[in-house]
Amino acid sequence: MPVIKVRENEPFDVALRRFKRSCEKAGVLAEVRRREFYEKPTTERKRAKASAVKRHAKKLARENARRTRLY
């Protein structure tokens, strides 16, 4: 859980914004959304594999685009 220290004479809005930013960087909300419902291990593995395939395809597309531009 991200912790921030409220500075002297710091407005509440600014402290809240800093806290939200630190939560976003730590990935707290994404983790909560991911754990909201139970996901079977097979479904979790399937989703992770699909994500890896998509990431790999994206990487190949980037490399291919870079190769075609250099002529």
UniProtKB/Swiss-Prot annotation:
Keyword Ribonucleoprotein listed: yes
One GO term of the biological process aspect: cytoplasmic translation
Compositionally biased residues, Basic residues: 46-59
Positions of region (Disordered): 43-71
Coiled coil: none
Annotated GO CC locations: cytoplasm; cytosol; cytosolic small ribosomal subunit
Transmembrane segments annotated in the record for this chain: none
Compositionally biased spans, kind Basic and acidic residues: 60-71
PROSITE patterns with a match to the protein in the record: RIBOSOMAL_S21
Pfam families: Ribosomal_S21
Highest taxon, organism lineage: Bacteria
InterPro entries per record: Ribosomal_bS21, Ribosomal_bS21_CS, Ribosomal_bS21_sf
Molecular function (Gene Ontology), one example: rRNA binding
Gene3D superfamilies the UniProt entry points to: Ribosomal protein S8 (1.20.5.1150)
Keywords: Ribonucleoprotein, Ribosomal protein, RNA-binding, rRNA-binding
Assembly behavior: Part of the 30S ribosomal subunit. In stalled ribosomes contacts ribosome rescue factor SmrB.
Family according to the record: Belongs to the bacterial ribosomal protein bS21 family.
Role this protein plays: Probbly involved in recognition of ribosome rescue factor SmrB in stalled/collided disomes; fusion of protein fragments to its N-terminus decreases ribosome rescue in the presence of SmrB.
Protein name per its UniProtKB record: Small ribosomal subunit protein bS21
The species this protein was found in: Escherichia coli (strain K12)
